């Protein structure tokens, strides 16, 4: 048996052509096969489309769809309260925080985390915050400064010290105040003396 297989392989590699009828491909039949062989450059060349019942394992329709258990990964596979934008790691980049006029009016009137107003703690503070945001949406900062311009200016100067906002790279100092990060020269330079370049850390 093995010798016959080897002999067939040798004949094929030696120049013997396998006829189309022995190939496991879908071919035309009847008059269409004669037309194809008449116009084909190589009549023994198949079209390459495999016979589905013989060259598909498992064959189509052989598996019971109810017998297949779809693997579910938690929490990615849980569709309840799991939208794609929450688990999209590719677009999960830092976004800029924007403070509108309504939020600015609420911060000036109610207070912030750094300078909270003690009298507006609890439910009264939450109600006052909602009212301040609604007032900021309708009137904006201009309307707020018309009524309490001097007090708002004093509050802003007390929080910032009369200076503009600090640039990025600020850190909390030892005294509890925000300070810009101090750059220091590295003790071991990353470049040799042939390339005089200072490294900061």
From Swiss-Prot:
Keyword entries, A-Z: Membrane, Mitochondrion, Mitochondrion inner membrane, NAD, Oxidoreductase, Translocase, Ubiquinone
EC numbers for this chain: 7.1.1.2
Reaction catalysed by this enzyme: a ubiquinone + NADH + 5 H(+)(in) = a ubiquinol + NAD(+) + 4 H(+)(out)
Domain of life: Eukaryota
InterPro entries the record matches: NADH_Ub_cplx-1_21kDa (IPR016813)
Keyword Cell inner membrane among UniProt keywords: no
Record bears the keyword Translocase: yes
GO cellular component entries: mitochondrial inner membrane
Predominant localisation class: mitochondrion
Subcellular location: Mitochondrion inner membrane
GO molecular function: NADH dehydrogenase (ubiquinone) activity
Entry function: Transfer of electrons from NADH to the respiratory chain. The immediate electron acceptor for the enzyme is believed to be ubiquinone.
Oligomeric form and interacting partners: Complex I is composed of about 40 different subunits.
Name recorded for this polypeptide: NADH-ubiquinone oxidoreductase 21.3 kDa subunit
Organism whose genome encodes this protein: Neurospora crassa (strain ATCC 24698 / 74-OR23-1A / CBS 708.71 / DSM 1257 / FGSC 987)
């Amino acid at each position: 048996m093995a010798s016959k297989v080897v002999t067939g392989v040798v004949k094929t590699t030696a120049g013997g052509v396998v006829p189309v009828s022995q190939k496991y491909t879908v071919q035309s039949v009847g008059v269409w096969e004669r037309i194809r062989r008449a116009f084909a450059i190589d009549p023994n060349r198949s079209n390459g489309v495999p016979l589905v019942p013989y060259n598909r394992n498992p064959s189509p329709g052989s598996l019971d769809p109810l017998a297949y258990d779809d693997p579910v990964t938690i929490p990615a596979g849980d569709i309840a309260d799991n939208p794609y934008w929450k688990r999209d790691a590719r677009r999960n980049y830092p976004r800029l925080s924007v403070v509108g006029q309504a939020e600015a009016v609420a911060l000036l009137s109610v207070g912030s985390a750094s300078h909270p107003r003690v009298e507006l703690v609890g439910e009264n503070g939450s109600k006052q915050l909602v009212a301040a945001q609604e007032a900021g949406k309708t009137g904006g900062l201009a309307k707020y400064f018309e009524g309490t311009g001097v007090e708002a200016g004093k509050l802003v100067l007390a929080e910032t010290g009369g200076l503009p906002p600090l640039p990025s790279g600020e850190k909390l100092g030892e005294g509890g105040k925000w300070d810009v990060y101090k750059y220091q020269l590295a003790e071991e330079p990353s470049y040799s003396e042939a390339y005089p370049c200072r490294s900061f850390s």
